[in-house]
């Protein structure tokens, strides 16, 4: 068995050359592995939730679902035009996908890996990222250089900190786990060793999203 997946294209706009570059490389790997005799399952798809999508749909005068339907259709058309050999194209608005997300969320919540708290920070809408004051560059988003706005909301968090020591030990004892070495060093030095932060896994201020919990 050989399972592979691409990153899923974000549907706030039409696919770009980076998306195309990735799907071509992934397709080449999938085809090569099939020639080697592997039973390959190759998956790709689209990410269809987020504030940028909500805002662009409002600007276009259509519903968010209509907006992502158009973009996802264009992504799939281009992938098919290039004869990519994916086995499954997943949209995050698919009913089956949403059910699985809710199932996993509930399981993690019930076992104490997800908890409710509040998130406060400086929010960059184009990047859909929260930042602290110390992370800003000249008072702006360190990724895109745009303005950020103060934001605070009730949210659910995944206890990544709970697994930090386990991850560090596994990476140290399995040096091939993250490749290339530069990415392993980046993960260790920038995230794990300074203290892994819990991850915010919900947004309460969006109208167009997938319901993860009853509230």
Residue ranges and their predicted role:
Residues 146, 214-215:
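Disulfide-stabilized cysteine-rich extracellular repeat microdomains
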Residues 1-205:
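N-terminal, positively charged nucleic-acid-binding surface of large information/translation enzymes
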Residues 208-213:
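Conserved small/polar residues in nucleotide/adenosyl-binding loops
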């Amino acid at each position: 068995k050989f399972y592979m997946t691409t990153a899923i294209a974000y549907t706030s706009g039409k696919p770009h050359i980076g998306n195309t570059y990735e799907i071509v490389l992934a397709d080449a790997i999938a085809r090569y592995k099939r020639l080697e005799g592997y039973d390959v399952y190759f998956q790709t798809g689209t990410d269809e939730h987020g504030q940028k999508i909500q805002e662009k749909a409002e600007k276009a005068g259509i519903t968010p679902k209509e907006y992502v339907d158009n973009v996802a259709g264009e992504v799939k058309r281009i992938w098919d035009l290039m004869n990519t050999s994916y086995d499954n194209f997943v949209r995050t608005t698919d009913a089956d996908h949403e059910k699985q997300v809710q199932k996993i969320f509930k399981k993690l919540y019930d076992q104490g890996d997800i908890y409710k708290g509040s998130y406060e920070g400086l929010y960059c809408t184009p990047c859909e990222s929260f930042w602290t004051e110390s992370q800003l560059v000249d008072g702006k988003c360190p990724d895109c250089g745009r303005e950020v706005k103060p934001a605070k909301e009730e949210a659910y968090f995944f206890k990544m900190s709970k697994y930090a020591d386990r991850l560090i030990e596994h990476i140290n004892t399995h040096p091939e786990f993250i490749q290339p070495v530069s990415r392993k060093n980046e993960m260790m030095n920038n995230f794990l060793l300074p203290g892994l932060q819990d991850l915010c896994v919900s947004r309460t201020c969006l109208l167009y999203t997938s319901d993860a919990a009853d509230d």
